C-alpha cells in the first residue's frame, strides 16, 4: 500500500481532534499543502533507504512525504499530544512498521537518536531554528546533509557571505560544519495559520573533514560571539576581552593569525576565526 499524504481538511480535523492550536510560543505553523512537502523532500534529495531525522513533525505532513520517498524517519516532537498521535497517523496512511520512530522530547535536549540518521529534513519552529540546527550538527556528527524550512531572515543569515548585511555569528557557526545555500522560497499560503513572515528552504552539506576538535570549536565560537557583540568595532577592541584583556594584546594574537587588527568581525570567514582561535589558545569557558 503506497504512502498517502495529509490534505488541508484532514490536518484541521486532526488538530481539532487533538485539541491542538498552532502556538506562537512553540513557533508552530503547520504545512497544509502536499505539493510543498514533496518539494522539500525533492530539494533535500531524499532517497530510498536514507535515515532521516525530522525536528518538529507536528501533525505529520512532511513526515509522510519523507516516508513516501522510501526513507526511514526519526521524528523529534516536543508536544506530547502530537508525538503520541503521529504513529497512528502514519499507520493509517500506509507507512510500514518500523519506518517511523517518534522521540517525545525537546530537540534542544536530545543528545542520542536511534538509527544514526544521516539527513536532516524539517519545518523548524521559527523561534528555535538556529539553536536546533547548531545543536544537531554539534551532537550528531553522522548528519551529512539536510534541508530545512526557516524564516526567510534566518535562512539568509545562515547562507550569508562575509561582508554582507546579514552575515553574523549564526553564519560563521553554521559554516564551521560546511557550506550552506538558499534552496528555494515557500509561499505563506501553504501554512496554517498563515504566518506574517516569509519562509525559505536552506540546505547544507557537512565537510568531509572536521575543522577541528570540540575544544577548538568552543574557542572559535567564543571569539565569534565577542566579534559580533560589537560588530562595528575593530577586532583589536571587540576581541580584547577574550584575547588577553587589552587591544594591544589582541593585536598581537590577530597578527599572529594573519588577520588585520583593524578589520571588523563581519569581514572574516570561518577559517579566519579558526586561525585566531588557534593563535590565541584562549581557555574554553567553564
List the model feature ranges, each with a label.
Residues 1-225, 255, 266, 275-286:
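Catalytic cores of RNA-modifying enzymes
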Residues 229:
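Active-site-proximal catalytic alpha-helix in oxidoreductases
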Residues 240-245:
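Short helix-coil junctions and helix-kink-helix linkers
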Residues 247-250:
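Short amphipathic alpha-helix in the helical subdomain of ABC transporter nucleotide-binding domains
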Residues 252-261:
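Short helix/strand-capping connector loops at secondary-structure junctions
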Residues 272:
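P-loop NTP-binding site
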Amino acid at each position: 500500500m503506497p504512502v498517502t499524504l495529509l490534505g488541508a481538511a484532514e490536518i484541521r480535523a486532526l488538530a481539532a481532534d487533538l485539541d491542538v492550536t498552532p502556538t506562537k510560543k512553540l513557533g508552530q505553523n503547520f504545512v497544509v499543502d502536499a505539493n510543498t512537502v514533496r518539494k522539500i523532500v525533492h530539494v533535500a534529495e531524499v532517497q530510498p533507504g536514507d535515515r532521516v531525522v525530522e525536528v518538529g513533525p507536528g501533525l505529520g505532513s512532511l513526515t509522510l512525504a519523507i516516508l513516501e520517498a522510501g526513507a526511514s524517519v526519526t521524528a523529534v516532537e516536543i508536544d506530547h499530544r502530537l508525538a503520541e498521535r503521529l504513529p497512528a497517523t502514519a499507520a493509517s496512511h500506509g507507512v510500514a512498521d518500523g519506518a517511523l520512530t517518534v522521540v517525545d522530547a525537546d530537540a534542544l535536549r536530545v543528545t542520542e537518536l536511534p538509527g544514526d540518521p544521516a539527513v536532516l529534513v524539517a519545518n523548524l519552529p521559527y523561534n528555535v531554528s538556529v539553536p536546533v540546527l547548531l545543536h544537531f550538527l554539534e551532537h550528531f556528527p553522522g548528519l551529512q546533509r539536510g534541508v530545512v524550512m526557516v524564516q526567510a531572515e534566518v535562512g539568509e543569515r545562515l547562507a550569508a557571505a562575509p561582508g554582507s548585511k546579514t552575515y553574523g555569528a549564526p553564519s560563521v557557526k553554521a559554516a564551521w560544519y560546511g557550506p550552506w545555500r538558499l534552496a528555494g522560497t515557500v509561499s505563506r499560503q501553504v501554512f496554517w495559520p498563515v504566518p506574517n513572515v516569509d519562509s525559505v528552504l536552506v540546505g547544507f552539506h557537512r565537510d568531509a573533514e572536521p575543522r577541528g576538535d570540540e575544544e577548538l570549536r568552543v574557542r572559535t565560537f567564543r571569539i565569534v560571539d565577542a566579534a559580533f557583540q560589537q560588530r562595528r568595532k575593530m577586532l583589536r577592541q571587540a576581541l580584547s576581552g577574550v584575547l588577553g584583556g587589552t587591544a594591544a594584546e589582541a593585536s598581537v594574537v590577530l597578527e599572529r593569525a594573519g588577520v588585520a587588527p583593524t578589520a571588523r568581525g563581519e569581514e572574516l570567514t570561518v577559517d579566519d576565526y579558526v586561525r585566531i582561535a588557534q593563535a590565541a589558545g584562549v581557555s574554553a569557558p567553564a
